[in-house]
C-alpha cells in the first residue's frame, strides 16, 4: 500500500457481473473471479486504518487490512495463510456473506459526508468500500490453484479424537481448529456431501458446488475424516460416540421452518423454503432420488413471503425455473429488511417484484392456492431487539393472485429425541444451551459441545464458523490441550 491516496485515484470496481438477461436463465455464479491485477488494484485502496472497523465488524475478526496489504504487494500465499488463521471457509464467506452490513459496511471509505454507513458499492459523498468480500474469495481460490495448502508440518498428534456431528459451517470450523491442534476430527453428516445448507440449500448462482468439493479435499488433506450418509440416532447412536470419542461437538443447524400462523398455510401449492431450494439443488447436481419431489415453478405465479436471504434465494430460483411472475412480500420496508442489499438488488434486476410493508394474513383458495391476502403496514416503535414493529393499517386488505406460495419466515432448531437421554438442555425455542459451563460452548453434558445455528438460532454462515472454531477451543481446554 505505497500510495495512501490510491482511493482518490481508483474507484471501487467489483468483479464483472453477468447481465441479468443472461444469468436469469442459468444456475451459475454471477460474479467473475478477479484477476491478480484487479485484486491488487482494489486491495491497494485500503487505508490501513489504525483502528480497523472492518475487522471488528467481521464475526470471525479477519485480519482484513493485513491480508489486503499482502494482496496489494503480490504475496498470495502469505495472504492465504493469514486468511485461514481466522476463517475456515474464506472462499465461501467471500461469496455469501452480506458484506454490505458487515466488513464493507464498516469500511471507512464507505461513509457519506455525515459519517452514516451506507450499503456496499459507490455512494453519495463517499468513495465506495474496498471490495473485501471478492478479494477474500480471490485469495483462497488463486492460492489453491497455485498449489497452496494449509501448513500442517508442525502439528503434533495428541492421540485424542473428537466426533463432530454436522458437516455444515459450525462443524467444519470446529474440525479445522481441532485438526490444527493435533486432535483427530471425525465428521458425521446425514447428507452425501459436506457443507450442509452451503451445499444443498444455497443455490448455485451464489456458490457453485465444486467450491465445497474442493474444500473437502483440502480438509481431508489436513487429516479430517468424513463419514457421510450417516445420521446420529439412526445409523449411529449418540452413546456409541460418547464411548468411542474423547468429546463430541454438535453443529446440526436449523432445519424446521417457522410458520406464519395464518389460515391457508396447509393448502396444496404452499411450499416451505428449504424443501423447495434443496429439491432444486439436488436436481441441478443430478442427485435427486427416484421418489424425490421436484418443485417446479415454470409458468406459475409465485409469491414469496419473507425478506431474508433465504427468501431472495427462493425468488431468484423461481425466476430461473421460468415462473410466470415472482412477487416478494415483506412486512417492513426495504431499509429494515434482514437480507443483503446486494441480493435484493440482484433479484430486482432479474425481474422480481417487491411489495414492501405488506403482511400476509391469509393464503386463499378452494382446495389449492389461488392468492395471498395482504394488509399494508406502517413501522411503529422499535421492539426489544431494536427493530421497528410493523403496525397494520386498518382497511388496507388486498388479495394478489398466486399459483404457488413459498414461505421463507426463517428456521428454528429441531431438538433430537436423544437429547434428554444425554442431559442436553434446550431453551424454550429449542436452542441448545451451551453457555455458563466450565468451557466455551460446553453443554450441560460435560463431554458434549455445541455451536452454530442450533445454539444461537438461524444466522449467518460466518457466525456459525466462528462458534464452531470457538467451541473447538473449548474442547481443547476440556482435553487439557491448551
Predicted features along the sequence, with ranges:
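Beta1-alpha1 glycine-rich phosphate/pyrophosphate-binding loop at the start
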Residues: 2-32, 61-73, 83-84, 112-133, ...
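Immediate flanking context of iron-sulfur cluster ligation sites
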Residues: 33-52, 76-102
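N-terminal cofactor/phosphate-binding cores enriched in small/glycine residues
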Residues: 42, 49-78, 89, 185-188, ...
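FAD-binding core/adjacent interface of flavoenzyme oxidoreductases
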Residues: 67, 91-165, 181, 226-300, ...
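A structured beta-alpha segment of the ubiquitous adenosine-cofactor-binding alpha/beta core
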Residues: 221-242, 290-294, 357-403
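FAD-site-proximal beta/loop scaffold in flavoenzymes
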Residues: 266-299, 383-458
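Long hydrophobic segments that form regular secondary structure
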Residues: 295-332, 389-390, 398-404, 411, ...
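A conserved FAD-binding loop/helix module that cradles the flavin
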Residues: 314, 454-482
Amino acid at each position: 500500500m505505497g500510495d495512501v491516496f490510491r482511493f482518490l485515484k481508483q474507484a471501487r470496481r467489483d468483479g464483472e457481473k453477468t447481465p441479468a438477461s443472461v444469468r436469469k436463465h442459468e444456475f451459475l455464479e454471477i460474479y467473475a473471479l478477479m484477476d491478480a491485477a484487479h485484486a491488487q488494484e482494489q486491495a491497494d485502496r485500503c487505508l490501513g486504518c489504525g483502528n480497523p472497523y472492518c475487522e471488528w465488524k467481521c464475526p470471525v475478526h479477519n485480519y482484513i487490512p493485513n491480508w489486503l496489504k499482502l494482496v496489494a504487494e503480490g504475496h498470495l500465499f502469505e495472504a492465504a495463510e493469514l486468511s485461514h488463521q481466522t476463517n475456515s471457509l474464506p472462499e465461501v464467506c467471500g461469496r455469501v456473506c452480506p458484506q454490505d452490513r458487515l466488513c464493507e459496511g464498516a469500511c471507512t471509505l464507505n461513509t457519506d459526508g455525515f459519517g452514516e454507513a451506507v450499503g456496499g458499492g459507490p455512494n453519495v459523498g463517499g468513495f465506495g468500500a474496498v471490495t473485501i468480500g471478492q478479494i477474500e474469495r480471490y485469495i483462497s481460490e488463486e492460492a489453491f490453484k497455485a498449489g497452496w495448502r494449509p501448513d500442517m508440518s508442525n502439528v503434533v498428534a495428541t492421540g485424542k479424537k473428537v466426533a463432530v456431528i454436522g458437516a455444515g459451517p459450525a462443524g467444519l470450523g470446529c474440525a479445522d481448529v481441532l485438526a490444527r491442534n493435533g486432535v483427530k476430527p471425525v465428521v458425521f453428516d446425514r447428507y452425501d456431501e459436506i457443507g450442509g445448507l452451503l451445499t444443498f440449500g444455497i443455490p448455485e448462482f451464489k456458490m457453485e458446488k465444486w467450491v465445497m468439493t474442493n474444500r473437502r479435499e483440502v480438509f481431508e488433506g489436513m487429516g479430517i475424516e468424513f463419514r457421510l450418509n450417516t445420521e446420529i440416532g439412526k445409523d449411529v447412536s449418540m452413546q456409541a460416540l460418547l464411548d468411542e470419542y474423547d468429546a463430541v461437538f454438535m453443529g446440526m443447524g436449523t432445519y424446521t421452518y417457522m410458520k406464519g400462523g395464518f389460515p391457508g398455510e396447509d393448502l396444496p401449492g404452499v411450499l416451505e423454503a428449504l424443501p423447495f431450494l434443496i429439491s432444486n439443488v439436488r436436481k441441478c447436481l443430478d442427485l435427486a432420488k427416484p421418489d424425490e419431489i421436484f418443485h417446479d415453478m415454470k409458468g406459475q405465479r409465485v409469491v414469496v413471503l419473507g425478506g431474508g436471504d433465504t427468501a431472495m434465494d427462493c425468488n431468484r430460483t423461481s425466476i430461473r425455473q421460468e415462473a410466470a411472475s415472482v412477487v416478494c412480500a415483506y412486512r417492513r420496508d426495504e431499509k429494515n429488511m434482514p437480507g443483503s442489499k446486494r441480493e435484493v438488488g440482484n433479484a430486482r434486476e432479474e425481474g422480481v417484484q417487491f411489495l414492501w410493508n405488506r403482511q400476509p394474513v391469509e393464503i386463499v383458495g378452494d382446495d389449492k392456492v389461488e392468492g395471498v391476502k395482504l394488509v399494508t403496514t406502517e413501522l411503529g416503535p422499535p421492539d426489544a431487539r431494536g427493530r421497528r414493529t410493523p403496525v397494520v393499517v386498518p382497511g388496507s386488505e388486498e388479495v394478489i393472485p398466486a399459483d404457488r406460495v413459498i414461505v421463507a419466515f426463517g428456521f428454528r432448531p429441531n431438538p433430537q429425541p436423544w437429547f434428554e437421554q444425554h442431559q442436553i438442555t434446550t431453551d424454550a425455542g429449542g436452542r441448545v444451551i451451551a453457555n455458563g459451563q466450565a468451557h466455551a460452548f460446553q453443554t450441560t453434558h460435560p463431554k458434549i459441545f455445541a455451536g452454530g445455528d442450533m445454539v444461537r438460532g438461524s444466522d449467518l454462515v460466518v457466525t456459525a464458523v466462528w462458534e464452531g472454531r470457538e467451541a473447538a477451543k473449548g474442547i481443547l481446554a476440556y482435553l487439557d490441550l491448551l
